[in-house]
């Protein structure tokens, strides 16, 4: 029963994320993406450095997103974090990613619940595949991620400036805590 309720809540939340575009009729500025993502290089662990969190991620500590290509071309994703504190209970979510734009590999649909695929865009990726920003056209959620649990203040400030330039409300941005 709890699982069914969670699926229902996730579905309603994702529908709510798109309702502004559906019902208001306004179309946000397009979200730019990187020119090309080498998916094999992108796979692996990414530590969430800062985020405008979804309801599932609120109060998350040690958040790590892991990507692995599956034989069918989809991307098996594992999102792991501790709920409430650094030593809190471990939570694991396993959405599936689907590359929507094969020319760039930078626009994905991320599916937590069938058949809904949430907008997921790689809007920044450094040349060494060590830091990335994932955004959404609706600008409701964003993730600054890195291959390491911490980054320099200079890099952090630069990434936050990029998020700001994309039109996000920085008041909602939360820095993640890692051990």
Question: Where are the language model's segments positioned?
Answer:
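Positively charged n-region of N-terminal signal peptides that target proteins for export
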Residues: 1-4
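Bacterial N-terminal signal peptides
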Residues: 7-14
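A beta-rich soluble binding module of mature secreted/lumenal proteins
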Residues: 17-179
């Amino acid at each position: 029963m709890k699982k069914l309720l969670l699926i229902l809540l996730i579905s309603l939340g994702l529908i709510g994320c798109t309702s502004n575009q559906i019902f208001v009729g306004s179309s946000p500025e397009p979200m730019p993406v990187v020119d090309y993502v080498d998916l094999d290089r992108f796979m692996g662990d990414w530590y969430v450095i800062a985020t405008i969190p979804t309801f599932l991620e609120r109060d998350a500590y040690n958040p790590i997103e892991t990507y692995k290509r599956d034989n069918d071309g989809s991307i098996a994703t594992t999102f792991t974090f501790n709920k409430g504190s650094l030593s809190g209970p471990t939570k694991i979510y396993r959405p599936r990613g689907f590359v929507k734009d094969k020319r760039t590999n930078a626009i994905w649909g991320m599916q937590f619940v069938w058949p809904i695929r949430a907008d997921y865009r790689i809007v920044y990726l450094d040349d060494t595949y060590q830091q990335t920003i994932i955004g959404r056209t609706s600008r409701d959620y964003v993730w600054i991620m890195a291959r390491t649990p911490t980054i320099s203040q200079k890099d952090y400030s630069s990434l936050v400036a990029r998020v700001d330039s994309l039109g996000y409300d920085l008041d909602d941005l939360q820095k993640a805590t890692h051990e």
